A protein has these predicted regions:
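Catalytic active-site module of serine/aspartate enzymes centered on a nucleophile-bearing elbow/loop
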Residues: 82-115
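Short linear functional motifs in flexible/disordered or boundary regions
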Residues: 8-12, 70-72, 88, 115
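Conserved loop-alpha-helix segment in the C-terminal half of the alpha/beta-hydrolase fold
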Residues: 41-91
C-alpha cells in the first residue's frame, strides 16, 4: 500500500474508505498471487512496441513514489505518438488523492484540449 496511498483514516476520500465489493479472482488469474512477479496468464504479455501504433490523445500520469516508476511511465511516453506525461512529485499511485487539486486542474486542461 505504500506505493498506492497513505494509510486510510476518517479524512480519506469515501471511495477509498468504503468496503470493496469485488473479488480478486480475475487479478490472480491474470497476474498471479505475487504482486511483483507476474506468473498468471499475462506473464508473457508485452504491449510496449505496439504503443507506437496508438492514434488517440494519451495522458500519462504517475507519481515519483508510484509502482509505475518514472522509467515505466517514460517508456510509455517515448512510444506513444504525441503523448503527454505528467510526473507528480511526492505522490504515489493514487495521485488524485495525494495532489487532488493539481490532478483535477490537469484533467480539465487536457480534456478541454481534446474534447
Amino acid at each position: 500500500m505504500r506505493h498506492c496511498n497513505s494509510p486510510l483514516n476518517e479524512n480519506s476520500p469515501e471511495c477509498l474508505r468504503r468496503e470493496a465489493k469485488i473479488g480478486n479472482e480475475s487479478y490472480i488469474t491474470a497476474w498471479g498471487p505475487n504482486e511483483f512477479t507476474p506468473i498468471g496468464n499475462l506473464k508473457d504479455f508485452n504491449y510496449t512496441e505496439k504503443l507506437r501504433n496508438w492514434k488517440v490523445p494519451s495522458l500519462i500520469i504517475s507519481g515519483t513514489s508510484d509502482l509505475c516508476t518514472p522509467l515505466l511511465a517514460k517508456t510509455m511516453y517515448d512510444r506513444i505518438p504525441g503523448a503527454r506525461w505528467e510526473l507528480f512529485e511526492d505522490s504515489k499511485h493514487l495521485v488524485y488523492v495525494d495532489q487532488n487539486e493539481k490532478y483535477i486542474n490537469l484533467l480539465i486542461e487536457w480534456l478541454n484540449k481534446y474534447d
